[in-house]
Amino acid sequence: MTDLMNKLAAVVAVASLAITLVAAGFAACAAFPQTTEMLAEAFSGNGNPGTPFSHDELVQAAVATRDYTVGSNDREAVFSMLHAINEGAGTPYADAAPDELAAAPEEYTLPADALSHLDDVYHVVAGARIGLIVVALVAVAACAHMAVRVGRRALGGVLMAAGIAVIAVFALLAAWVVADFNGFFAAFHSLFFANGTWTFSYDSLLITMYPPEFWIGMGAVWLAATGLLSIASVVVGALLRRKRA
């Protein structure tokens, strides 16, 4: 019975640690406004020279929209931002009331369908955050069990297995992104959102702030963070599995 429990703990440890490594990469993307600001500085406005907003205004909008989507979800704050950038750019909606700004063309504002999609993202992220914290705690507990009840070499095996599994999966996903970014992007969104709720015109403010290059960059950040942590997991695991002299 003890052997069975230890094997079960090993499986749980590998699975929960692998999920936690992936989640850590997502946290690097979503938890820090600096990530959005860096990528917006590099890519916002790409492909839409006709946007009424300056690059700095688009970066300001991208950071504020990121807070609405994965942070405060404060609609008043996001409309305050929309008013500020329209006023700064001197658009026809510079002095528009909130309801008029909400009904403006999507080149100037975040219309109802865009805000609805951002609300959907907020709810997915909020729910995932709780679940991933629980998974991380399970990973810590299962790894502690392996270290205390089975031994350091068993823990090393868990660390290596989780890291190698994540590296293999991310290598396949990276190849998919390189071969067909649009297909990957569509498949990823279809996991969480209904068809038709996350597509917007290329000259909309939302896509102007976050063009495809922005999301490729965000994926690179996720890949780098998760990849480095996974490599560290493999290295530490290999060290733990070494026989002591």
Predicted features along the sequence, with ranges:
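Membrane-interfacial loop-to-transmembrane-helix junctions in polytopic alpha-helical membrane proteins
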Residues: 2-12, 114-127, 152-158, 209-212
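Juxtamembrane interface at the cytosolic side of transmembrane helices
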Residues: 1-11, 133-185, 231-245
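Juxtamembrane non-transmembrane "cap" segments at the membrane-aqueous interface
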Residues: 178-202
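Aromatic-rich transmembrane-lumenal/periplasmic boundary elements in polytopic membrane proteins
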Residues: 22-76
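Short, membrane-exposed interhelical loops at transmembrane-helix boundaries
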Residues: 194-216
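Hydrophobic secretory-pathway targeting helix
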Residues: 1-37
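Individual transmembrane alpha-helix segments
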Residues: 73-134, 212-223
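N-terminal type II signal-anchor transmembrane helix
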Residues: 14-28, 221-236
